Amino acid sequence: MNSNSSVQFNEQGVPVSTTFDDIYFSVESGVDESQYVFLAQNGLPRRWLSLPAHYSFTIAETGFGTGLNFLLTWKRFLEQAPANTRLHFVSFEKFPLSRQQLEQAYQLLEPIAEFSQSFLEHYPATDPGCHRIILSQGRVILDLWIGDLNELLPEWLPQAQKQIDAWFLDGFAPAKNPEMWQPTLFDAMKQTAHSGTTFATFTAAGSVKRALQQNGFEVQKVAGFGRKRDMLCGHYLSAEVCQKYYDRRDVTIIGGGISAACSALALKHRGVNVRVISAGSADGASGNPQGAVYPLLHAEYTPLSRFYWQAFSTATSFYRNFCDDHWFPVGVMQPAFNDDRARRYQRIADELYAPDTVRYLSQPEAEQEAGVSLAVPALLYPKAGWLRPAAVVKSLLETAQIELIEGEAKALEKTESGSWQISLKDGSLLAAERVLIATGHHINGLLPESVNPLPIQPVRGQVSLVQTTPLLSSLKTVLCFKGYLVPEDGNHHCVGASFNRDREDLEPTPEDDEENLKQLAENAKQPWAESLQLTSQRVSVRATSPDHQPVTGAVAENLYVITALGSRGFTSAPILAEVIACQLTGELTPLTQDALRRISVSRFKG
């Protein structure tokens, strides 16, 4: 599924596409070219100076290439836009460069070196789909869509109506890359334009000029950069004033786990006043001592795999940004304990995903990577890892600087104005403009009678903590089998977890500890997995849905839910929080329409 660009570097060090026989940026000065063609001809940074508070200025680009336009725009925005505004940059790229190719290209881009190096730290694996990267403490968002523009635009368009403030039409020249300059693109520009939308492109091709005019744009031909004589720029001609919509009304979140914390931060980034009601932070599974973050990948490229891969891509960048002290990207390994599993793992690694996402390791390679003895080959997620759940939740809530109300919500009642009244168990009442419920398997207990219950199933899980040993202390990666084993933290390892459907009891049992340790020993079949000393345990209840997908979205006017994150809550919470925050504020989500439907509350209706 991965399609990297064929690139060579000429004598000047400029990257050249061998596919399109064209350079990625000017030999004279790529930075100056980008500044002149794309920023200046779109009226930037001048237009930023008059943006209203909390406005998200949104740019769409065709052809991410080396990311030069994004990097320069990011730099200029931080330097010159009002501090209470945000930048959302959406870029489409069919042939992504590898990290190594970017590193080489950036050697010529010294004026933006600080930003190029920061971006490289977050550059994702180049698998298809949208990679959402949150930068500059949430003030800048990059949505990097990998794939064919003509296939991606129809899935992206429904949520992008009148949302784009400026278009950067890059990519290679129409004569060399005609597949990109199709009616699909120009129709998308028309649908996403509002009264203030502008565009700029390096080309002056007559076919491009005519297509833009036919789709409602006034087109100007101006002097090109350097040796190029002409280029095109212009703005959308709207018969009526059509303004971009955005909503910043207050939100009250009920819940104290990872989905609540991520949602609070995502909303706070967008200028929304947020308060969180919780009996205590890091409740439920979010309070476990250690947790693994890795995707769910199948031997076929299924919608479920696609969602969890995308969630994983967002999560690893997110935790690096906001919880670096409690995030350990040491890799996650899935040993292949039988031949059938080995064949499936090899197909996943060799045919479906990029090496930066997943690699198949022989038995000696797996043993060396894990740091402990292993008898079988394994699948390795090199960018995955583990975190400290309670510390992560606490850190996110502190970063968000939101109002935290200690208490337990008992009921919700809709008011005549369309807002909500929240009753707490201590008898107090709170008024809320909008409410987001993030209480896991308890969610149906808070839904008003007018809302149909959601098909959420509780799953009880017990994790066991064991004392480290001389053999076990050398474990470097998370090991996942039917359960999991996490590297040492404070002389202890977390072993988990039991899986008991339709149980909500929170009392630990010796039987579950015995099963966790037995399962580890039987799967590993190694001396380090034997005679482990149990030190403590913890029980929590996860929420799951019938189709194993999370559940998000509106259940009533001004009432939203986020639940059913299951056993991969720390993998999916960051992207789900972005989705719900975008839906609440009127911004672009990082998911396709199909993916949004699959996690929507509405899939259970009818």
UniProtKB/Swiss-Prot annotation:
Q: tRNA (mnm(5)s(2)U34)-methyltransferase: where is this region?
A: 1-237
Tell me which EC number(s) this protein carries: 2.1.1.61, 1.5.-.-
Which biological process annotations from GO are given for this protein? methylation; tRNA wobble base modification
Q: Where in the cell is it found?
A: Cytoplasm
Instruction: Please verify whether the record's keywords include Aminoacyl-tRNA synthetase.
Output: no
Asked if Hydrolase is a keyword of the record, the answer is no
GO CC annotation terms, alphabetical: cytoplasm
Any matching Pfam family:
DAO
Which cofactors are required for activity?
Answer: FAD
- Recall the GO molecular function terms of this protein's record: flavin adenine dinucleotide binding; oxidoreductase activity, acting on the CH-NH group of donors; tRNA (5-methylaminomethyl-2-thiouridylate)(34)-methyltransferase activity
Alphabetized UniProt keyword annotations: Cytoplasm, FAD, Flavoprotein, Methyltransferase, Multifunctional enzyme, Oxidoreductase, S-adenosyl-L-methionine, Transferase, tRNA processing
Quickly give the catalysed reaction. Answer: 5-aminomethyl-2-thiouridine(34) in tRNA + S-adenosyl-L-methionine = 5-methylaminomethyl-2-thiouridine(34) in tRNA + S-adenosyl-L-homocysteine + H(+)
* Region (FAD-dependent cmnm(5)s(2)U34 oxidoreductase) residue spans: 254-606
Query: Which HAMAP family would you find in this protein's record?
Result: MnmC (MF_01102)
Q: Describe the task this protein carries out.
A: Catalyzes the last two steps in the biosynthesis of 5-methylaminomethyl-2-thiouridine (mnm(5)s(2)U) at the wobble position (U34) in tRNA. Catalyzes the FAD-dependent demodification of cmnm(5)s(2)U34 to nm(5)s(2)U34, followed by the transfer of a methyl group from S-adenosyl-L-methionine to nm(5)s(2)U34, to form mnm(5)s(2)U34.
Family from the record: In the N-terminal section; belongs to the methyltransferase superfamily. tRNA (mnm(5)s(2)U34)-methyltransferase family.
**Under what name is this protein listed?**
tRNA 5-methylaminomethyl-2-thiouridine biosynthesis bifunctional protein MnmC
Please tell me the species this chain comes from. Idiomarina loihiensis (strain ATCC BAA-735 / DSM 15497 / L2-TR)
